[in-house]
């Protein structure tokens, strides 16, 4: 039996927009809920309410691939020492109003047990499960969502740029409380993709702001108490910085450094992602899901992440049996042979995952550079084309990726109906002669060493920031790009860094260029086109100021007409109500994106996998974990140890 949640679902079509979708009905065994044995003593001592009281009236019911599991055990895994908060997000943080099913086929209920949408795709209504609770036992209601909306999202000090998930054509959503359990999201124009967006990426925003906890740090609610709090938190210069130090998006550091922050996640941190040698989480006693036998989830008691600096060390520790689960940074061709050979000694198996981004290695020049000379050159499409032709992609793939991959630009994968061959293949031919000829028209003068001079007569140098992440050997890739660029007169200086430092540079708009992978290889291109246009999402900052402008038209910088046309084309994708209309508009958008050619891709993605202990059950095979889908977090609650350790 495959993993499923036996409910009507909403696929990409919005033809059922007026239909109310119901969550799991209240089980017949509601009076006989069961809990993990580790909680028994707390309940007996009166330190914790009974499990039936902790659960909502209609908990979400999970159906498992291997059946009802067993309680107990600690899941051992690993995380990079710095800047790898995405690892935590993908493991324990994906609780949303609505959710994609694990096979990415349909959107269904989650925290909202019912939801409906208007026929014109402008109004969406959600009914929360009654009795939901934060991890500290306090009620989660519509008031928490309204706190996010009125006091965070619409507060220009806290949210100067509005998150695009909750805007249409630069205009923010209007959120209205109907009652304690019912909330309405209304847009000024059609937003046919809203449910899909809400189940993806940054759709967690409305449900991560506990009002009862965070209001103490908000000037509106505690103006008189803020000075004392600032004195106790000297690193925060004002109430805005103080508030932002207590909460953030789930893939940003503050979310994982504040142990006092209540959440709706299945596990809560007891050791933060900070200076310790490991990160530790224990079960949330108020988690709101059960299995078909009435057992409160999750099955596994706790999770530990060993903090390591080196992906190679991660792989070696996996083969020696020190981890029960791993997938980030080592699930690629670089480590596959070692990990395959180590399955017996490490007592683990390979599990297929569907992780197909738009490209595994993408050169992203900062089109909004604060250096006016570099900005002008980076924004010149012919410069980007010339640099693209200078790169010997096949040589990189052969030497760095042991032949796994194919030369390609940022593009939807060939297996998908939206595949655009022109977009995938344009400017990928290794042609240094053509590259040099194009560059001669842009920067004809050279210095004594053969490097090109900019219009001010200075050597044109690209400072390339490189973080060794995902196990994709980015430093090795950029060293080869550096050589190819030198052959056509472009000076690239490689600056190695870690992800945390790179994050800081992105948000300050300080980088010249960097290399990263790009989402959008499959259907997430509809909801997450961040590599195809300036779009305010995590990790992709090739045109941050333009993406800020796109989100609300009042911040950032107005882009050129060609980019504005690209943004307008995506607005049409968002507004489309039917599948056919949306599909055609997305094809139009991708054609415009190909015309703009904003980023330089190197290699089509390699097959991915994850490793799980042979002792782990209910592990879904072939799960998509691409982009901001945040898998495998939605299925981790059903994992269990066949022989849990005491």
Regions found by a protein language model. Give the residues of each.
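Aromatic- and charge-enriched surface segment that lines or borders ligand/interaction sites
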Residues: 113-159, 184-186, 194-195, 317, ...
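Extracellular/periplasmic solute-recognition and catalytic clefts
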Residues: 154-162, 175-177, 270-282, 306-372, ...
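N-terminal lobe/hinge region of extracytoplasmic solute-binding protein
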Residues: 41-44, 49-119, 150
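Detector for C-terminal structural segments
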Residues: 59-60, 261-262, 267-279, 283, ...
């Amino acid at each position: 039996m495959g993993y499923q949640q036996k409910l009507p679902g909403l696929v990409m079509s919005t033809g059922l927009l007026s239909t109310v979708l119901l969550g799991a009905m209240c089980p017949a065994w509601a009076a006989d809920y069961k809990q993990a044995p580790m909680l028994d003593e707390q309940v007996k001592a009166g330190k914790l309410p009974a499990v039936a009281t902790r659960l909502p009236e209609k908990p979400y019911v999970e159906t498992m691939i291997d059946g009802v599991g067993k309680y107990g055990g600690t899941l051992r895994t690993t995380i990079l020492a710095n800047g790898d908060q995405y690892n935590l997000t993908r493991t324990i943080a994906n609780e949303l109003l609505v959710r994609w099913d694990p096979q990415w086929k349909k959107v269904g209920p989650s925290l909202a047990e019912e939801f409906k949408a208007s026929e014109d795709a402008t109004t969406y209504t959600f009914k929360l499960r009654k009795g939901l609770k934060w991890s500290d036992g306090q009620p989660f209601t519509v008031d928490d969502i309204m706190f996010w909306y009125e006091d965070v999202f619409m507060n220009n000090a806290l949210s100067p740029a509005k998150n695009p998930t909750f805007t249409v054509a630069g205009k923010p959503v209007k959120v209205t409380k109907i009652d304690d359990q019912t909330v309405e999201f209304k847009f000024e124009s059609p937003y046919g993709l809203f449910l899909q967006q809400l189940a993806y990426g940054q759709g967690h925003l409305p449900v991560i702001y506990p009002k009862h906890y965070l209001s103490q740090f908000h000037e509106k609610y505690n103006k008189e108490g803020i000075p004392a709090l600032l004195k106790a938190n000297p690193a925060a210069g004002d109430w805005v910085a103080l508030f932002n130090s207590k909460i953030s998006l789930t893939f940003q550091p503050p979310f994982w450094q504040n142990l006092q922050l209540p959440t709706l996640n299945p596990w809560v941190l007891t050791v933060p992602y900070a200076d310790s040698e490991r990160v530790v989480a224990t079960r949330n006693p108020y988690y709101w899901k059960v299995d078909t036998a009435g057992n409160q989830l999750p099955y596994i008691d706790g999770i530990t992440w060993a903090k390591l600096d080196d992906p190679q060390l991660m792989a070696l520790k996996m083969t020696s049996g020190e981890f029960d689960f791993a997938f980030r940074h080592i699930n690629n061709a670089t480590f596959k042979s070692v990990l395959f050979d180590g399955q017996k000694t490490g007592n683990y198996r390979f599990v297929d995952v569907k992780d197909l981004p738009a490209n595994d290695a993408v050169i992203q020049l900062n089109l909004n550079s604060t250096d006016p000379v570099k900005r002008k050159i980076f924004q010149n499409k012919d410069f980007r084309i010339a640099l693209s032709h200078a790169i010997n992609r096949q040589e990189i793939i052969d030497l760095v990726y042991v032949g796994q991959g194919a030369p390609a630009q940022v593009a939807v994968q060939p297996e998908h109906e939206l595949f655009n061959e022109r977009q995938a293949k344009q400017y990928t031919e290794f042609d240094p002669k053509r590259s040099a000829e194009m560059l001669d028209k842009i920067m004809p003068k050279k210095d004594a060493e053969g490097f090109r001079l900019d219009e001010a007569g200075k050597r044109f140098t690209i400072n390339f920031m490189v973080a060794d992440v995902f196990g994709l050997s980015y430093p090795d890739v950029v060293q080869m790009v550096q050589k190819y660029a030198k052959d056509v007169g472009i000076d690239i200086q490689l600056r190695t860094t870690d992800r945390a430092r790179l994050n800081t540079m992105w948000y300050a708009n300080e980088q010249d260029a960097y290399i990263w992978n790009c989402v959008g290889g499959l259907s997430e291109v509809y909801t997450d086109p961040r590599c195809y246009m300036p779009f305010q999402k995590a990790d992709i900052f090739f045109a941050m100021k333009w993406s800020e402008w796109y989100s609300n038209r009042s911040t950032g910088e107005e882009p050129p007409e060609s980019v504005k046309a690209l943004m307008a084309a995506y607005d049409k994708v968002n507004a489309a109500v039917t599948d056919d209309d949306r599909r055609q508009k997305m094809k139009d958008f991708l054609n415009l994106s190909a015309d703009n050619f904003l980023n330089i891709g190197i290699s089509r993605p390699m097959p991915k996998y994850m490793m799980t202990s042979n002792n782990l059950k209910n592990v879904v095979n072939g799960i998509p974990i691409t982009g901001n889908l945040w898998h495998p977090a939605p299925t981790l609650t059903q994992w269990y140890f066949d022989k849990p350790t005491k």
